[in-house]
Amino acid sequence: MVSQFDTQHLLNSNTALVAGVDEAGRGPLAGPVVVAAVVFDPSQPRINGLNDSKQLSPACRERLYAHIVERALAYKVVMIDSTQIDTLNIYQATMLGMRLAVEGVAHVAKSARIDGNRLPKNLPCPAEALVGGDARDPTIMAASILAKVTRDRHMVELHLQYPHYGFDKHKGYGTPAHLAALAEHGPCLEHRQSFAPVRRMLTPKAIHARQSAHQHNDNSPTKAAFNMLIERDD
């Protein structure tokens, strides 16, 4: 367990308003990494069936998603797209998403508990990192479900735009079917060009298309946020 601030009060309190934070989609070859933060009222009963999203069926995740949104005092879901992932790297993109998600619930949360062993910089509240938190902490479990469901829905939408790749089935992960589609059609704008299986199949046309899309998105709020992150890390 890693602490950015003095979190002894957090560990000893049963009534603290704690934001659980988790991500989905660090490993895929395409699509965004999605981070969610959730705050529950600790005086209310736990939602039945909460678990690490990877241990739940899609139907169960969808059912729990509705309950989580209904019961949460606050929640925030952040998507960091493939262009930003390629600019920052997947680790820094995930850290950015976590910081933005916590900022989105900081008006309610007094502290944050984040799945993993690292914490983002410049969080707006005290925080702790909890290894295996998505299997240990109900609030992190809820965040993992919001992140996973949001990302899966987004990949189904991307399938309508790019039907050749089967995003609706593998959600961007490097399955044999996805790799075969990459070999046949080459990467699209949603592929992560910094990931080796995609990078090996890049063409000048694909690189130019990504650069054009990157320039088009230069003024987005999230782009400004990750520029600030890069400056702080220099």
UniProtKB/Swiss-Prot annotation:
Its EC number is 3.1.26.4. A divalent metal cation binds at residues 22-23, 115. Manganese or magnesium. Binds 1 divalent metal ion per monomer in the absence of substrate. May bind a second metal ion after substrate binding. GO terms for biological process: DNA replication, removal of RNA primer; mismatch repair. It is found in: Cytoplasm. The keyword Manganese applies. The keyword tRNA-binding does not apply. GO terms for cellular component: cytoplasm; ribonuclease H2 complex. GO terms for molecular function: manganese ion binding; RNA binding; RNA-DNA hybrid ribonuclease activity. Its cofactor is Mn(2+); Mg(2+). It is an enzyme of class 3 (hydrolase). InterPro entries: RNase_HII (IPR022898), RNase_HII/HIII (IPR001352), RNase_HII/HIII_dom (IPR024567), RNaseH-like_sf (IPR012337), RNaseH_sf (IPR036397). Its main location: cytoplasm. Residues 16-207 form the RNase H type-2 domain. Pfam families: RNase_HII. Keywords: Cytoplasm, Endonuclease, Hydrolase, Manganese, Metal-binding, Nuclease. It catalyses: Endonucleolytic cleavage to 5'-phosphomonoester. Endonuclease that specifically degrades the RNA of RNA-DNA hybrids. Belongs to the RNase HII family. This is Ribonuclease HII.
